[in-house]
Amino acid sequence: SWKDRNALIVHSDKGIETHRSAIGESLITPNRNIYIRNNMPTMSDSQIGDRSNWKVSIKGVKNPKTFSLAQLKKLGHTTMATILQCSGNGRGFFAHKVRGSQWKTGAAACVLWTGVPMKLVVDACGGIDSDAVFMTSAGVDHEPTGLDPKKAKVERSVPKKVYKDAMLAWEMNGVPLPNAHGGPLRMVT
């Protein structure tokens, strides 16, 4: 297994927290100790297929385009460190019970991401459309049968100026982005 079971607390198949004792053993959190929080089941390697052919569509730009992961890699890349934290981190300490995994302090990590800066992607598409206000990313999660996607779709929108500091990441801590962490490609802002 690629996760250290002794360092993790399993809340559900889509929610795994890191034990407090396993946080801070190094500046960068090893992948084996990084929490997992997903709304939908993780895509399998067979669903993803050849990662280099994975496609992403860029809209809200002057010349909308679809890029393969291989094409994105040709645009250039950078590596940056960020704090990755679930917005529900600490909810287990609330005086009143709230929905979701009862995270304590283990839904946080320091991660090195490698990918293409969104600025390079936007430039390759002729710049941002003048009507654009936000940058939004959405995955292609496959909803389980019977689930209403309108109730389960998760999108994150940020002001469009953030695109200059964002990236489409394909590596996490020097290895291909694991499926459970959004692989083969995820937005990092």
Model regions: which residues?
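Structured, non-membrane catalytic/scaffold regions adjacent to prosthetic-group chemistry
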Residues: S1-T189
